[in-house]
Amino acid sequence: MEDVISLSRYFVENDTTIVDIGCSTGKLTKAMIEYNQDHCNNASWIGVEIADGFVDDLKKRYEEITKKDKTIDVEFIMEDIRDFEFEECSLVTSIFTLQFMPKKDRKEVISNIYRGLHDGGAFIFSEKTICENALVQDMITFNYYDYKRKTFTTEDIMDKERTLRHMMKPNTWEEISDMLCEAGFSNIQPFWRNHAFVGAIAIK
């Protein structure tokens, strides 16, 4: 998340909108506001979340932000990102969110993001990916399990795996890159990788 916050400074502009897709508790949104407030105090910040379980957290986060500075234009909305209209955006972020969407819906959302960005605006995102080669996929998966066992029990790991198995719809990096290109992005660059996870930036 620190990379996303620091990269945001290159794109956030006054009189534009910044959208945080799948904002959950609003932690990233708040951090980006604070990081950019010294040079950009007239932007609109929108956190979009679909899960009702975050309503109370987002109310508290809104109060935290506006208590410090009532002039900050920020809102958290409960909405399916597939129905959201991106307008006048300088930056859109998505941290491990689009990977839960079917490919068709993901392509449509990425196209909507591209159309809603200013020229020079950016889409910064992170996703879990899968490998094209089954052997490499197994190696990365088991290596990740070994890493997780340092903190969690095997039972905890497998319970989470079973929970996410039918919810997550990961793609290969090549498929993700193709979706971005089809939407119109021509400048696409990964900036972070860890096991099967990747963070990348796509600039319009």
Show where each model-derived region lies.
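A short glycine-rich, Lys/Arg-flanked "PGG" loop and its adjoining helix->strand segment in the class I
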Residues: 107-119
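Core SAM-dependent methyltransferase catalytic element
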Residues: 186-204
